[in-house]
Amino acid sequence: MKLTVVGCTGSMSGPFSPASSYLVQALGEDPQTGQERVFNVLMDLGPGSFGALWRYIDARKIDAVLFSHLHADHIADVVSLHVHRRWFPTGPLGPILLAGPDGLMDRVRGVDGVGPEETYAGEFTPHILTAGEPITVGPMTFTPYPANHTVPAFGFRVQGPSEGNPLEQVELAYTGDTDTCDSIIDMARGVKLLMSEAGFTKADKPRGVHLTGERAGAIAKEAGVELLVLTHIQPWTDPRVVIEEARMEWEGAISTAYAGATYTI
């Protein structure tokens, strides 16, 4: 599998990155043609991310979009995706899987500013996430785990073929937005890469909203991950501060996400 950071700024688009969006890719057999091809799945599609995605893939080739939760900084560019798929110059591109928490399509209509008569049937096949029920896209499996956030939210554990050896299965995990909770620790156990939000620093006191670097580091330590990548850092926060806080708990490999970063798993 390959993971590309399309956008990673916390809570909004920023001067150096769009808001949250992560592209996961893997080579597998197309069930319709029997030929091998690259499958493309997006986890979240925040403001500015759809345009940025064009730097990395042909946007017509998206197979699925999975939303960790329905806050605008993680879903707003679904409207751009809808317009692209409905009005592409050579004709409609057809529906793709759109998965998220309960209330998904009402939220999409709200962002789009349309009423219940809009079904998006030509662009999206909606699916409501259920904790522990995996979604399979090509050779990849995405299993949602409940997160600890202000609205219903999930993290994803992703299993798929190794880039180095397609016969080997490897795993990564993405927290979405969350504070510490047992289910997110379970999600991260033993993965090669944990993409963990760190939207707060130690100076931020509210709980049940975001992780700090320190709390993300503690999750990485307890879960036994190989690489911790900190993301969803606010544009006013120095990433070095978040790294320093994570180092209070985590002694392993660590980095901060940035737009365009790629990781082969």
What are these regions (language model features)?
Residues 180-264:
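Cap/insert and terminal regions of metallo-dependent hydrolase folds
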